[in-house]
């Protein structure tokens, strides 16, 4: 909206608005501040309303009885606090992002769509007073629908051509460097850039610490890329959901993971920095950076009330959606494997559950961990909740640093 306002004031009222307000860096800062302040100042009113509506959290006791004792004080703490986070982010989106860019549309649809799924999941848990909620198949189906829509836009020429023709949304412009070597000295000559199509862009698979794509899909093999997109979005969404089990744990880990992707999105939108790092120049990826800044601000504001002892939980409304936003952002930036590094805590949490279930079924009910996800295992070992959270935050920060460093060490 800020860009519309600037254009209107300059075109209709002939007022000269400082160009600083159109800079990506400025809008990133303003988006973070907006969502942070909204989360903090609306938090008390929102939490009070949740108490009045008796939207309390149920505690998992079935397969980990000790959790009922450890988390007894958390019983009936309000949940669905993700509504506060998502609302703050969407306000920032409307105020500070370019509403004509396709990345803005994709991130908006992702937030609303996954927010509704998470909200439905929380509603069923509250209705039946248990921790089951929606069936796993039901959630996977809707996550597949979202992933299929995003994959179709990038991989099917007819779909993105339709958007270019019939909508006002600007497609991203992607350029790669062409490095020429002198045949005699074998030294690299000044690089040039060439534009690549959305389909070619989306068909490439990049791995951290490697400059060039390791695989480029084409033809029928594009189906594999579509399933890979589904795996990334669904995996990140559900992994974040599994991580949301201790006061402040997920919010803190989201800040570091989103911060890493935010930095990558910002430098990908800068011609000179992209050339220096020898990465793809993605015109418009700054919009992703703005939204991730809004996510960071909203998460920090929510952490104000979600830190130990938590006054509110984000619930699946927040965790499923925020994890999905990270996954979608990684897909848009073609940094899916990098997300596996910067979101290392999410990967560890998800793997702990997968290994625990597999071991229980295949090894005659033998368990690898005392309790899964991983953070509960350390609780069972006697670690205080705050110590588990802080140590996981430290590891999350370490993973984020490694992920960012991979851009330089290619």
From Swiss-Prot:
Compartmental location: Cell inner membrane
InterPro entries, per the entry: Glycosyl_transferase_4 (IPR000715), PNAcMuramoyl-5peptid_Trfase (IPR003524), PNAcMuramoyl-5peptid_Trfase_CS (IPR018480)
This protein's UniProt keywords: Cell cycle, Cell division, Cell inner membrane, Cell membrane, Cell shape, Cell wall biogenesis/degradation, Magnesium, Membrane, Metal-binding, Peptidoglycan synthesis, Transferase, Transmembrane, Transmembrane helix
Cofactor: Mg(2+)
Its membrane topology: Multi-pass membrane protein
CDD domains from the UniProt entry: GT_MraY
Enzyme class: transferase
One GO location term (cellular component): plasma membrane
PANTHER family in alphabetical order: PHOSPHO-N-ACETYLMURAMOYL-PENTAPEPTIDE-TRANSFERASE, PHOSPHO-N-ACETYLMURAMOYL-PENTAPEPTIDE-TRANSFERASE HOMOLOG
Protein name: Phospho-N-acetylmuramoyl-pentapeptide-transferase
